[in-house]
Design a protein with these regions (language model features):
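Bacterial N-terminal signal peptides
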Residues: 13-22
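N-terminal acidic, proline/glycine-rich, low-complexity intrinsically disordered segments
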Residues: 2-4, 25-30
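Helix-centric, low-specificity signal for extended rod-like, repetitive segments
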Residues: 2-3, 20, 173
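Hydrophobic small-molecule pocket/channel-lining residues, especially in calycin-type beta-barrels
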Residues: 27-202
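Bacterial N-terminal signal peptides that target proteins for export
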Residues: 2-13
Length: 202
C-alpha cells in the first residue's frame, strides 16, 4: 500500500528536475524561430529578379554587330559584321545572346549568358563560340547601376596555359552598347584587342 505514494513522489521529483531543461529548450526554440523566418525571407528575396536583372533585360532585342580587332593595323577597314539576338530567360533572371558573324571570311557563331547574382552581388557571364570547345566564365561589378560592367575571367591559350581576360560592357544609349576585350601583354601592360559595337535593329 505504500508503493504507490513512493512512485508518485519519484514521478513528481523527476518532473521538477526536468522543468528547467524544458524551459531552456523552449527558449532556444523561440529564439531560433525569428532567425529561421529571416533566412526564409532572405532566400525568397534573392531568388527574384531585381533592378540589376531588369536593366540587363532592357538589352533584349535584335542587333547588328560590328567587330573590330583594334590592335591590328587598319582595324576599321578590316571590321567584321554580324547579327545578335538577345532574349530574356527564366522569368527575367538571365539574358541569353545568340550571335552570328563573318570574321575574316569565315562564319563564327556564339552564345553568351549574362546575369546578376543576388547573393554575391556580382554580375556573371558565360561565353561560348564555335572557335573553341571551352567555356569562358566571367564575374563583374558595376558602379553605375549596370551601365558599365567590368568583367574579369580566364581564357586558355593553345598550349593550355591560363590567360587573364578583362572585358567591359558599356551602355551608350537605349539602342547601342559596346563590349571591349582586353588582355595583359608580356610587358605587363593591359591593352584592348577587340571591340564589338551592338546597334539595335529598327
Amino acid at each position: 500500500m505504500k508503493l504507490a505514494p513512493r512512485c508518485g513522489r519519484r514521478a513528481l521529483l523527476a518532473a521538477l528536475l526536468l522543468l528547467p531543461v524544458a524551459a531552456v529548450f523552449a527558449q532556444d526554440q523561440s529564439a531560433q524561430k525569428p532567425e529561421a523566418a529571416t533566412d526564409t525571407h532572405q532566400t525568397a528575396d534573392t531568388t527574384k529578379p531585381g533592378p540589376e536583372q531588369e536593366f540587363l533585360g532592357k538589352r533584349s532585342g535584335e542587333y547588328t554587330r560590328t567587330v573590330k580587332f583594334v590592335a591590328q593595323p587598319n582595324a576599321d577597314a578590316n571590321a567584321s559584321t554580324g547579327t545578335s539576338k538577345m532574349s530574356v530567360a527564366l522569368g527575367g533572371r538571365f539574358i541569353v545572346e545568340e550571335n552570328n558573324d563573318t570574321v575574316f571570311g569565315r562564319p563564327v557563331s556564339g552564345t553568351r549568358i549574362y546575369g546578376f547574382n543576388n547573393i554575391t552581388k556580382q554580375y556573371e557571364a558565360v561565353w561560348m563560340y564555335t572557335g573553341s570547345t571551352a567555356m569562358i566564365f566571367l564575374t563583374g561589378t558595376s558602379s553605375d547601376g549596370g551601365k558599365t560592367i567590368d568583367f574579369n575571367g580566364m581564357t586558355q591559350n593553345l598550349r593550355g596555359g591560363k590567360v587573364p581576360l578583362h572585358a567591359t560592357m558599356r551602355q551608350i544609349d537605349d539602342n547601342q552598347f559596346v563590349v571591349t576585350l582586353m588582355s595583359t601583354g608580356a610587358d605587363g601592360k593591359e591593352a584592348a584587342f577587340q571591340e564589338t559595337t551592338y546597334t539595335r535593329k529598327k
